[in-house]
Amino acid sequence: PKSFQKNPIPGTKFTIAISSAKGGVGKSTFATNLALALKKVGCKVGLLDADIYGPSLPKLFSINEKPESDGQTLKPIIKYDIQCMSIGFLTDEQTPMIWRGPMVTSAIKTFTQKVAWKDLDFIIVDMPPGTGDTQLTFAQEIKIDGAIIVSTPQEVALLDVKRGIRMFD
């Protein structure tokens, strides 16, 4: 089997992934509230919206601007003293994201390696629902210090949660 070298996201101490097996369970709301709570207790926090197909951070934080770039790196947008990045900052809200796996993987690598995250105690990663290319890229390449799986209490949903937990092991 192939061995993967997992690296931390540059400029960060701890990476916390917020994931779910299904959409619409409150994952993005939880991720933003966790980021705000950590900020409130004095931590330096970043929030990465890794949901390429359905980014919600621009709406949740009312961000309508585009990040600055020096041609090599993207500068996170600061809102509520939290460093933020989302594909939603780079595309029009009406533009459908019809990307295949390699494009998604490339975008995730850009957000984890080419964003100028600065001196963060925590970066909260709002993952898309399910176990697709985004989750695989993170699980294989990024050092994840903790994962929180958000779910509803139905038995079938909890079975999916167990599978999701194994992915981050």
Model-derived segments and their meaning:
Residues 12, 23, 49, 57, ...:
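Residue-level signature of catalytic and energy-coupling elements of molecular machines
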